[in-house]
Amino acid sequence: GIFKQSIKTVALGYLIVFVLLVIGHLIGLSYVYEFGISNSISNINVFVVISQLAAYIWGFANFNIATIGSQSLFLPSLFKTSLSIDFKLCLIAFVALSALILFISGIKLNNKYKTSSKKPVLIFSVFYAVIMASLSIFTYVNINGGSLLGYNIAMNTNVILTLIMSFIYSFIVTFVGFKLSNWD
């Protein structure tokens, strides 16, 4: 029940971010290169990088700190980065998307469990945070010589911070959806 809902929530968010990044790449809005990743890598490698980038952007959208290439992304300091303004706005849209998905998950939890207790939201948030932390463990990437100047590029997140921030963020947003679905 709740574990399956948390997996679906993470998967949906990741999939939407991935599809939007692929579409952006295909129509020429390749934000991959804003992180210092060389445009000389093959299309197959670009899709591998995009699949990883989607995980980090989904993490960022959950208020986690993501290091991608030469950029450290964290929402409060986003506008201090050298990323283009349109990509910064896209990142903010991804934050809104994650909030919407978690809000809807809260509504679904309320509709399924019909309780005034915080327990379903708490359990969901624990599962969600553990899944996000697991993703951050398994999605560490180091690209040797993949930058414009031939330097190594790393993409990673801090596992402990991901666990904590994902729990807090998912609990707050899911709880709001959970409570507002009872509001008449």
PLM features: what roles do these ranges have?
Residues 108-184:
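Alpha-helical transmembrane segments of multi-pass integral membrane proteins
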Residues 16-19, 23, 93, 97, ...:
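Lipid-exposed faces of alpha-helical membrane segments in multi-pass integral membrane proteins
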Residues 6-10, 14, 23, 27, ...:
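Hydrophobic, Leu/Ile/Phe/Ala-enriched alpha-helical segments that form helix-helix packing faces
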Residues 1-19, 113-126:
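Alpha-helical transmembrane segments and their helix-start/interface "positive-inside/aromatic belt" motifs
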